[in-house]
Amino acid sequence: KRQHEILTFSYVAARIMESVFIAVGILAVLAIVTLRHDAGADAASLGGLAESLAAIKDWTFNLGPGFVVGIGNGLILGYLMLRSGLMPRGLALLGVIGGPLQTLAGIGVLFDLYDAGGPVQSIATIPEIIWELSLGIYPLIWGFRSSPIVAEEGRPVLHPAVLAR
C-alpha cells in the first residue's frame, strides 16, 4: 500500500486552491482592462470599480502564491519527498522549512504587518524558492532516487495487449 494518500490529495487540493486564487486575480485584471476601454460609463464610477478589482487582485495573489503555496508546495510536498526519499534529505528539508516560513510571511502580509514583496517576505521566501528550483533541477540532472515505497510493490503489471507489441 502506498503511504500518505491523504497528504497526496491534500497537496493536489492546495495546488487547485492556489490556481483558483490566481485565476480570480487574473480575471480581475482583465476586468480592469475591459473597463479602461469602456468609454460609455462615468469615469468616477469606473475608477472606483477599477480600484476594487485591483484590491481583489492583490488579495488573491496574497492568498494564493503568498499563503497557499507554502502549505501545498512547501510543507506537504516537501514532507512527501522527505518521507519517500525521492529527493535528497537536505533539499526536501528546504521545502519543509521554507513552506511554513512563506506561509508565516504571507500571514504577516495579510495582517498588514509588512508590505507584500517587501524585504521581510522576500527573505522568508528564499528557502521556498530554492526548494522549487531544486524540485525541477535535481530530477532533470540526476533523476529521482529510487523509492523504497515503490520498490516494495515490485514491477508494475502490464496489460497483455501492451506485452504483445
Language-model regions, residue ranges each:
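Hydrophobic, aromatic-enriched alpha-helical segments typical of multi-pass transmembrane helices
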Residues: K1-R165
